[in-house]
């Protein structure tokens, strides 16, 4: 991302909006939520694109679906193209996916220019809401015959590419068993083909466009389109091409997903088969047989490698394994003779009893293995393994008939040899699935049955998730250790045929007196009990057993001289218990005292501080009371001085009121007297008039 583009965006939009912040980090790869906030802020601040979105779309929480985001951005792009008249190459789907930050910044720059130039967007909003797509004004319609032919050719090629991709997807699903290298090569070739076709299309379109332009220039110069319209046409073409490529990539991704699902199913089936085989082998004691078989294979490698892959396939198809039987029988007999001559007389004497037991165990384990092989008809095995199995079956049948002529001797392998065997088996298990086809027969037939599923397993594609962690299988070692708990010898898996007579066998072996069965059983029982106690008992059980032993010792009958001592000890223990209880009580009381002393001391400290504060406050209030009392007295003196003349005036007024009241009373008395006189005079006049 160029820093100059971000700077231009900051200059254009920084004058229009203040938030969200136009930082270089956000503008270099703008997320949709950031673009949504910018557009809503532009609408709120300037009114540009007002009415384009509903109230629900203005809230970013409602625009979470991919289609909703694409439609949101498409509306904004259409309005900006209509208002500005400039072509925009930004694709909403690419913007939502986080691609094309430069074109996204170009969109933001044009929005800022429209807002700064105060261009009206009402007409464009109306047209976009009516369903019209954003196009540059004055764009000439491409109605020439050459352009139509180009479009037809493009459509035909698109249909061919679509059919080819579908056919390829079907073929890839059918051929999912091929190796990763071949698939990668085929996919590279198939990816190159549509690219080359796209290049041819672009060249053909450019040639057709050039011819068309030259013809138009010669026919009519007035119809010449401006540069911006040509750029818009190119942008639309590129947009169509991008959409086509997206569709193709989506189809390919869908096909790849189907392939991955099928591969995962095959892998799960192989894993389940491998687990079932492991369980059967653990049950039947086949792990020890596999270890011995791997040791035997190390001797058989040069002879088995000489057999060609064609002969092996013929043997497998026809079912004739006579040559392999003969070879395995001869190898078994030679190995048995070598092992018999190299054994010492001491080991023979020690294993004389154990060998008889182990003969039965080996026969049983081989029978179980044969039954397990018959139960798995779909299991793929190499010719060498089949030959050894048949040889073992023949040897078991011979051992049933001639049990006296068969002997098995075992030597306990060293731990270094065990580690080597494990490491080699792990290495073979890891190197199994590396680039092998089904049609090819493996050169090393020593691969065990566990690896047959790994060979048939399809390699993981590069786009797959990381594989789960591998669990290290230690079942074989655990099974061996459980089998060897009674004795330190392993059970031999090869039952050799001896064509010699009984006398020759007696000459080869040195027979010694075997220990009695009762002694052997006692030794085995003691070792088994000790092992079980060591393995089963944990720390708690051991402590319980120790306490039980101590208790049993205490319950034994005491001696006569120890009675007094025991009484003294019991009395001493009682006194000790009483003293310890009193000490414990004292300790608890001291602890409670200490616990209460600390908060008490803190309270006392706080009380002292509070008392000082209260005394200071009391003095303050006393002084304030004194001041207020003095002020009150001063005010009283002032009021007294001011009220004295008023009091004198009041006294005068009261005196005047009394005088006036006296005058009124005197006037009333005169009026009453005059009325009496008038009445008397009227009465006297009436009397005189009557006369």
From Swiss-Prot:
One of its GO terms (cellular component) is ciliary tip. Ubiquitous. The keyword Coiled coil applies. Changing residue 520 to R: In SLSN9; does not localize to the ciliary tip. GO terms for biological process: cilium assembly; defense response to virus; embryonic camera-type eye development; embryonic digit morphogenesis; embryonic heart tube development; intraciliary anterograde transport; intraciliary transport; kidney development. Its main location: cytoplasm. Residues 391-405 have a biased composition (Low complexity). Residues 147-328, 351-361 have a biased composition (Basic and acidic residues). GO terms for molecular function: microtubule binding. The keyword rRNA processing does not apply. Keywords: Cell projection, Ciliopathy, Cilium, Cilium biogenesis/degradation, Coiled coil, Cytoplasm, Cytoskeleton, Disease variant, Leber congenital amaurosis, Nephronophthisis, Phosphoprotein, Senior-Loken syndrome. Signal peptide: none annotated. It is found in: Cytoplasm, Cytoskeleton; Cell projection, Cilium; Cytoplasm, Cytoskeleton, Cilium axoneme; Cytoplasm, Cytoskeleton, Cilium basal body. Residues 331-343, 371-386, 487-498 have a biased composition (Polar residues). Residues 223-691 are annotated as: DISC1-interaction domain. The modification Phosphoserine is found at residues 317, 476. Residues 571-666 form a coiled coil. Residues 1-323 are annotated as: Abolishes microtubules-binding when missing. Pfam families: MIP-T3 (PF10243), MIP-T3_C (PF17749). Residues 136-508 are annotated as: Disordered. Changing residue 17 to S: In SLSN9; results in altered folding of the N-terminus; does not affect interaction with IFT20; loss of interaction with MAP4. It is linked to Senior-Loken syndrome 9: A renal-retinal disorder characterized by progressive wasting of the filtering unit of the kidney (nephronophthisis), with or without medullary cystic renal disease, and progressive eye disease. Typically this disorder becomes apparent during the first year of life. Component of the IFT complex B, at least composed of IFT20, IFT22, IFT25, IFT27, IFT46, IFT52, TRAF3IP1/IFT54, IFT57, IFT74, IFT80, IFT81, and IFT88. Interacts with IFT88. Interacts with IL13RA1. Binds to microtubules, TRAF3 and DISC1. Interacts with MAP4. Plays an inhibitory role on IL13 signaling by binding to IL13RA1. Involved in suppression of IL13-induced STAT6 phosphorylation, transcriptional activity and DNA-binding. Recruits TRAF3 and DISC1 to the microtubules. Involved in kidney development and epithelial morphogenesis. Involved in the regulation of microtubule cytoskeleton organization. Is a negative regulator of microtubule stability, acting through the control of MAP4 levels. Involved in ciliogenesis. Belongs to the TRAF3IP1 family. This is TRAF3-interacting protein 1. The gene is TRAF3IP1.
